[in-house]
Amino acid sequence: MNTTFALGNGLKVIDLTKPLDPKTESRRCHLIRYNTGGPIPDFHTAMDLTSHLGTHCECPYHHDDNWPSVAELPLTTFMGRAIYVDFKDTLPHRKHISAADLDKATEGWVKEGDILIIDSSYKLAPFTPDTNTDKDQRLLVNGETAQWCVDHKIKCVGFGDGVSIENCNEDVKPFHDICICLLYTSPSP
């Protein structure tokens, strides 16, 4: 399947969508195909999905009921220049990605408004029985990782399967608090 599409003038779109397969998903993913009936075939699919499945956005609404949903975020949040940082196996497994690690990996490439995608060679499909076990060797994020993104005015951050974003509350909460609260919401008056 082609995932890169040329737009002209040197611009391209790269589709990062992970396919959803109800047979292999570990979280709620049910697709019910049916024909509405009548003389003309009219097929539809009823979907019963959890919001944290496949390619998804951690939107402000996920963090606070009073904050914007994905539908309220500007589409431009998810479009633009992107930097892919693949640490491969250059960092020890289960290491928190530090500001120094990101500085070294990006070496001045990051610009204000960029999208940052972080990955490593320690891949593991998320949300499986192996998540957060000894088999899970992925790199980790925390408040320091998030603060680096905010300090460098990253507008959107994404992760490959080589980075764990839900290893423990002590890391997850600060990461979400800093990125979601500071990147997507306005301070209260």
Roles of regions detected by a PLM:
Residues 1-40:
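Generic N-terminal segment detector
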Residues 16, 56, 85, 116, ...:
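Divalent metal-coordination and catalytic microenvironments
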Residues 184-189:
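Conserved small/polar residues in nucleotide/adenosyl-binding loops
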